[in-house]
Amino acid sequence: MKSTATPRFWQLLNALPADVQALAEKNYRLWAEDPQHPSLHFKRLAGSGHRFSVRVGDHYRAIGWKVADGGVEWVWIGSHAEYDLLLKRR
């Protein structure tokens, strides 16, 4: 699956610990080959037709928007605790 990432996504990713960055890279490659791989938990966010989340290990998540060409634009990555707060705000 094709994807892009926003400058903000890269900023957030680069602020994460090196081991989390490496895991995000590994999971991205897996997602690009098989978005439905069970370990990724790639899923549409509740109440949203175009927002998706993907697992980055047990403690981190990334959020992306479905774009016109069918790909995903990654917009956010952070801890699961921050992810939970974001979902409560919507």
For every predicted segment, state its role.
Residues 11, 35-40, 78-81:
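Residue-level signal for pocket-adjacent positions within structured domains
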Residues 29-54:
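A short, surface-exposed loop/turn module that caps and links secondary-structure elements
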